[in-house]
């Protein structure tokens, strides 16, 4: 994975984690106001991700599209808040269920980010093993020269 993809993965992870944290806190008091703040705070990340996803490969672009879809869905909730408040249907099951669905989807994005981090760790371990293998080969060749 190029460094750009890892950087974008980290940006996605930070953005998704911020959204996920805001969704968890939004249940307590006035979830729509906090959701609006989340959307506003994530928009700069989304712009950066859009710029980089045009350059990067398709798997990262798919994650970006999913995140964009979730943000658009959250924006719909923010726009619908005054109407919901007028009708006093804030506690209706279908809206709570929709927010829980978004939260579960954000968890899957966070898992993707962790997988990116794990991939980076695996690449580092492979590099270390390769270095150890070359050093071991040098030591063995040096020992065989000494015996001869």
UniProtKB/Swiss-Prot annotation:
<keyword id="KW-1133">Transmembrane helix</keyword>
<dbReference type="Pfam" id="PF05659">
    <property type="entry name" value="RPW8"/>
</dbReference>
<keyword id="KW-0472">Membrane</keyword>
<keyword id="KW-0381">Hypersensitive response</keyword>
<comment type="function">
    <text>Disease resistance (R) protein that induces localized, salicylic acid-dependent defenses. Confers resistance to powdery mildew (e.g. Erysiphe cichoracearum UCSC1).</text>
</comment>
<feature type="coiled-coil region">
    <location>
        <begin position="120"/>
        <end position="140"/>
    </location>
</feature>
<dbReference type="GO" id="GO:0009626">
    <property type="term" value="P:plant-type hypersensitive response"/>
</dbReference>
<dbReference type="GO" id="GO:0016020">
    <property type="term" value="C:membrane"/>
</dbReference>
<protein>
    <recommendedName>
        <fullName>Protein RESISTANCE TO POWDERY MILDEW 8.1</fullName>
    </recommendedName>
</protein>
<keyword id="KW-0611">Plant defense</keyword>
<keyword id="KW-0812">Transmembrane</keyword>
<dbReference type="GO" id="GO:0045087">
    <property type="term" value="P:innate immune response"/>
</dbReference>
<keyword id="KW-0175">Coiled coil</keyword>
<feature type="transmembrane region" description="Helical">
    <location>
        <begin position="7"/>
        <end position="23"/>
    </location>
</feature>
<dbReference type="InterPro" id="IPR008808">
    <property type="entry name" value="Powdery_mildew-R_dom"/>
</dbReference>
<dbReference type="GO" id="GO:0009620">
    <property type="term" value="P:response to fungus"/>
</dbReference>
<comment type="similarity">
    <text>Belongs to the plant RPW8 protein family.</text>
</comment>
<dbReference type="GO" id="GO:0009610">
    <property type="term" value="P:response to symbiotic fungus"/>
</dbReference>
<feature type="domain" description="RPW8">
    <location>
        <begin position="1"/>
        <end position="148"/>
    </location>
</feature>
<dbReference type="GO" id="GO:0050832">
    <property type="term" value="P:defense response to fungus"/>
</dbReference>
């Amino acid at each position: 994975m190029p460094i750009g993809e890892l950087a974008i993965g980290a940006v996605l992870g930070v953005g998704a984690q911020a959204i996920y944290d805001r969704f968890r806190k939004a249940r307590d008091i006035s979830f729509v106001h906090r959701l609006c703040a989340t959307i506003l705070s994530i928009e700069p990340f989304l712009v950066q991700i859009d710029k980089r996803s045009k350059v990067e490969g398709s798997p990262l672009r798919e994650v970006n599209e999913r995140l964009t879809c979730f943000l658009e869905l959250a924006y719909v909730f923010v726009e619908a808040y005054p109407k919901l408040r007028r009708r006093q249907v804030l506690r209706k099951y279908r809206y709570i269920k929709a927010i829980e669905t978004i939260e579960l989807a954000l968890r899957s994005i966070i898992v993707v980010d962790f997988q990116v981090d794990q991939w980076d760790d695996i690449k580092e371990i492979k590099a270390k093993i390769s270095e150890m293998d070359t050093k071991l080969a040098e030591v063995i060749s040096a020992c065989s020269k000494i015996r001869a």
